[in-house]
Amino acid sequence: MAKRGPTTGTLLPRVLLALVVALADRGTAAPNGTRHAELGHGWDGLVARSLARLPVAAQPPQAAVRSGAGDYLLGLKRLRRLYCNVGIGFHLQVLPDGRIGGVHADTRDSLLELSPVQRGVVSIFGVASRFFVAMSSRGKLFGVPFFTDECKFKEILLPNNYNAYESYAYPGMFMALSKNGRTKKGNRVSPTMKVTHFLPRL
């Protein structure tokens, strides 16, 4: 007697099993505990970069935490240098020890990653130093290894095509560099002042 082919009752479980295996492969965890499919997506990328600094044993089971930021700004991350046309002209830089300042030449510490965290709000991340730019409640700029609310800046396009970066946590405080390339306190400047004007450029 000829053998009968697989019945519908046996095919369905096999198909479902194949789908489950395929989905599991797509969600395979990366070495630092984050999921490949979630790295770099808005808040997920920020959280992933912060959690990557923790020892593996200290990382939570699911490091890539989903948030309500949404994925509508996906793929808009920019590698830029922020140029402030004061004094001899300075690029914002994030030093390896977390200090923020200005440097005239293009350096590895002046290469920044601007990432959207919500509409009109970005984080500024030092590619070489691995520190986020943050602003304290007193208007002081400093670098931190972990993403917090103090790392959020409203990116405001000015009439001269430069940008101003206002602290999201402390409205009315702006990122600024002096004519000597030092940071100025955000509560002592305004967007009408040239020291707060930054041009994102490659």
From Swiss-Prot:
Pfam family for this entry, one: FGF
KW Secreted (keyword) present: yes
Molecular functions per Gene Ontology: growth factor activity
Subunit relationships: Interacts with FGFR1, FGFR2, FGFR3 and FGFR4. Affinity between fibroblast growth factors (FGFs) and their receptors is increased by heparan sulfate glycosaminoglycans that function as coreceptors.
Biological function: Plays an important role in the regulation of embryonic development, cell proliferation, and cell differentiation. Is essential for survival of the postimplantation mouse embryo. Required for normal limb and cardiac valve development during embryogenesis. May play a role in embryonic molar tooth bud development via inducing the expression of MSX1, MSX2 and MSX1-mediated expression of SDC1 in dental mesenchyme cells.
Family: Belongs to the heparin-binding growth factors family.
Protein name from the UniProt record: Fibroblast growth factor 4
Organism: Mus musculus
